[in-house]
């Protein structure tokens, strides 16, 4: 998987405030058990270079706050999978390009983004400014609709979705999942926080239940019964009648022995990635995509309790 795509599908990049090479392997195990496999540490933090060298075998490890080409060379030699430079530095960008490693320069203004785009970059880093962060990001996205943004600081699991909900955002560096290098007894807590963050990012919720019928007339009658009894307004939506938004009555035998269940997610690409990590299989012939190429809907390969299950974009 290409690095930018890996960042996008993970969504969450765990920020390591105090890197410790001795804890790299247990940290990687704890994070991966929670569904996360990308980390970022500031390269000027004590022990950062050794941590990246130790963790790059297990995780996609990024080096942040790179200020000089020399620092970039050290980070790349240590095994950094991506670089976040402190500004738009053409020499750092060139060094990374030679190694086929993404360079994501920190961009604070439209002029910064323009300079990065002029150097051929399609993704940059953006550090939010408190509560004004989402508005500032929206302004940059309006000026540069083809640019993608890595959110690089000041984000927690409680605030990340304000950014991850934006289609231009690759991922967020999220603080608080790992506050310090985890000792052995902290591994379970790291895994728990990672799982909680993933579920918060995906924001799964039941969207509707699907009922299979043999034909349009039966579907009409079935949806009509729900309208009559419960006041769920019937609506013909082409391939199915809906009773409100809760019940989809198919006009033919469709997926699922008993019907289907739709589970909505904030981002279907990220949901599919996490579910595959958990062992789920997908029927990719059922996949539908948004005009921009993002996954919109896809069915699981296996039924659950006799129901087909599909993941649907919120």
Indicate where each model-derived feature is located:
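N-terminal beta-strand motif that seeds the catalytic metal site of vicinal oxygen chelate
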Residues: 3-16, 198-223, 256-263
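Catalytic beta/alpha-barrel core
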Residues: 15-17, 37-45, 59-67, 80-88, ...
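Conserved, mostly hydrophobic/aromatic
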Residues: 14, 31, 75, 124, ...
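Core segments of cupin and vicinal oxygen chelate
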Residues: 44-46, 210-248, 277, 288-296
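Glycine-rich phosphate-binding active-site loops on the catalytic face of alpha/beta enzymes
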Residues: 82, 87-92, 126-134, 167-190
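C-terminal helical cap(s) of enzyme catalytic domains, especially alpha/beta-barrels
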Residues: 95-101, 180-203
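Vicinal oxygen chelate
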Residues: 246-250, 276-314
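Catalytic cores of alpha/beta
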Residues: 27, 68-78, 111-119, 155-170
């Amino acid at each position: 998987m290409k690095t930018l795509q890996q960042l996008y599908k993970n969504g969450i990049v765990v920020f390591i405030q105090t890197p410790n090479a001795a804890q790299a392997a247990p940290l990687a195990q704890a994070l991966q058990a929670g569904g996360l496999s990308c980390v970022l540490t500031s390269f000027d933090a004590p022990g950062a270079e050794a941590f990246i060298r130790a963790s790059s075998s297990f995780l996609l490890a990024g080096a942040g706050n790179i200020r000089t080409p020399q620092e970039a060379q050290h980070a790349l030699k240590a095994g950094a999978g991506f670089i976040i430079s402190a500004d738009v530095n053409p020499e750092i960008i060139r060094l990374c390009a030679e190694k086929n490693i993404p360079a994501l320069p920190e961009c604070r203004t439209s002029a910064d983004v323009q300079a990065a785009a002029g150097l051929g970059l399609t993704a940059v880093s953006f550090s939010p400014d408190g509560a004004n962060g989402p508005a500032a990001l929206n302004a940059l996205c309006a000026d540069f609709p083809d640019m993608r943004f890595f959110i690089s600081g000041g984000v927690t699991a409680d605030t990340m979705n304000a950014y991850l909900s934006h289609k231009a955002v690759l991922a967020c560096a999220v603080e608080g999942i790992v506050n310090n290098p985890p000792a052995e007894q902290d591994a379970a807590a790291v895994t728990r926080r990672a799982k909680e963050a993933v579920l918060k990012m995906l924001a799964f919720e039941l969207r509707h239940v699907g009922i299979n019928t043999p034909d349009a007339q039966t579907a009409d009658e079935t949806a009509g019964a729900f309208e009559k009894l419960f006041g769920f307004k019937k609506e013909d939506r082409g391939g199915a009648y809906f009773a409100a938004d809760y019940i989809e009555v198919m006009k033919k035998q469709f997926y699922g022995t008993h019907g289907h269940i739709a589970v909505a997610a904030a981002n279907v690409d990220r949901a599919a990635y996490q579910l595959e990590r958990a062992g789920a299989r997908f029927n990719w012939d059922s996949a539908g995509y948004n005009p921009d190429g993002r996954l919109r809907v896809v069915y699981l390969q296996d039924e659950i309790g006799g129901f087909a299950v599909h993941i649907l974009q919120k």
